Design a protein with these regions (language model features):
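Cleavable N-terminal export/targeting peptides
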Residues: 1-29
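Outer-membrane beta-barrel transmembrane domain signature
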Residues: 60-70, 76-191
């Protein structure tokens, strides 16, 4: 129930922000940096893979005053994933999420020293893994697709934002043999 209320509150905020602004009044922000992710099978507490990579997170927000905004963020990334059995794979992720930003870099007019944000959406964290069966393509997609949520903080570093966040791709319980993915990001922002 809390998740539903949170999603409705976020949707209401986005609607309120867009109602008072036209699409031309939005602001673009970008962040790029390091992404560490682990696959986590909650039924067995196994860790099927770990990944190191880079993420680019563009966002388009509508200001609500000088210290708050609502909008959309679409992080994409690429990394090298290593499975628990020693195999190295290509990992990649993509997400589309609603976002609520407060404080630093929530708007271009903000002069706060620190800030925070919450993202809620849908996306996928996938790996191209070697097909050892011998039939079909040499590599197959092993994806963890589901609801994405992320929380983070940011602070000012020499005039630009530095973001530290934790995210989760939560796969449905009906997705057998698919792991949830926990991601830690350190991103450098600019606009």
């Amino acid at each position: 129930m809390k998740k539903l209320l949170s999603a409705l509150a976020l949707a209401a905020g986005v609607h309120a922000a867009s109602a008072q602004n036209s699409i031309k009044d939005g602001e673009w922000f970008h962040a790029v940096g390091y992404d560490y992710a682990i696959g986590l099978d909650l039924s067995t507490l196994a860790m099927p893979f770990a990944s190191n990579g880079v993420t680019w997170a563009p966002r388009y927000t509508f200001p609500v005053g000088d210290e708050m905004s609502f909008g959309v963020v679409a992080p994409v990334g690429l990394g090298i994933a290593q499975s628990q059995f020693g195999g190295i794979n290509l990992g990649y992720h993509y997400t589309l999420a609603a976002t609520m930003q407060v404080g630093l870099a929530s708007t271009q007019a903000s002069n706060a020293f620190i800030g925070a944000f919450v993202n809620l959406g849908y996306g996928s964290y996938a790996r191209q893994v070697r097909n050892n069966i011998g039939i079909g393509p040499a590599f197959v997609r092993d994806g963890s697709t589901g609801v994405f949520s992320e929380v983070g903080v940011r602070y000012d570093y020499m005039g630009n934002e530095v973001n530290l966040s934790a995210g989760l791709w939560r796969v449905p319980t009906s997705a057998v043999d698919k792991a949830d993915v926990v991601s830690l990001r350190l991103l450098y922002g600019f606009w």
